[in-house]
């Protein structure tokens, strides 16, 4: 069974927030997944849609798969490096702000007939 893969790395959204979106489309048909993403009011839908479209394009171009028969076999989010920033506080103190990044991986496969 052939599978096509796409990875978006260093996406500047917290992995926790991206996982909320990713969990909605795991195991779904690609067209259904894109429709779900279109109507989900979360900021993470934009990079997830982009990487899903990239996986579909990879399937079509590299493996000659039928784009209408593709399903999202795997989709997961890993934590990337954290950017550390400082927020000044009262009396000369400082708090650390952690700007988290995500790596989004999508694997699509062609659904078998029957």
From Swiss-Prot:
It comes from the Bacteria. GO terms for cellular component: cytosolic large ribosomal subunit. Keywords: Ribonucleoprotein, Ribosomal protein, RNA-binding, rRNA-binding. Pfam families: Ribosomal_L22. GO terms for molecular function: rRNA binding; structural constituent of ribosome. HAMAP family: Ribosomal_uL22_B. PANTHER family: CHLOROPLAST 50S RIBOSOMAL PROTEIN L22-RELATED (PTHR13501), LARGE RIBOSOMAL SUBUNIT PROTEIN UL22M (PTHR13501:SF8). This protein binds specifically to 23S rRNA; its binding is stimulated by other ribosomal proteins, e.g. L4, L17, and L20. It is important during the early stages of 50S assembly. It makes multiple contacts with different domains of the 23S rRNA in the assembled 50S subunit and ribosome. Belongs to the universal ribosomal protein uL22 family. This is Large ribosomal subunit protein uL22. The gene is rplV.
């Amino acid at each position: 069974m052939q599978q096509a893969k796409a990875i978006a790395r260093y996406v500047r959204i917290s992995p926790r927030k991206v996982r909320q979106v990713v969990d909605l489309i795991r195991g779904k048909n690609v067209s259904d997944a894109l429709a779900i993403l279109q109507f989900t009011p979360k900021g993470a839908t934009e990079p997830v849609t982009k990487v899903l479209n990239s996986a579909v394009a990879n399937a079509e171009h590299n493996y000659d798969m039928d784009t209408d028969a593709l399903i999202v076999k795997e989709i997961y989010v890993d934590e990337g490096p954290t950017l550390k920033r400082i927020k000044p506080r009262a009396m000369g103190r400082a708090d650390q702000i952690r700007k988290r990044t995500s790596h989004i991986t999508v694997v699509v496969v062609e659904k078998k007939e029957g």
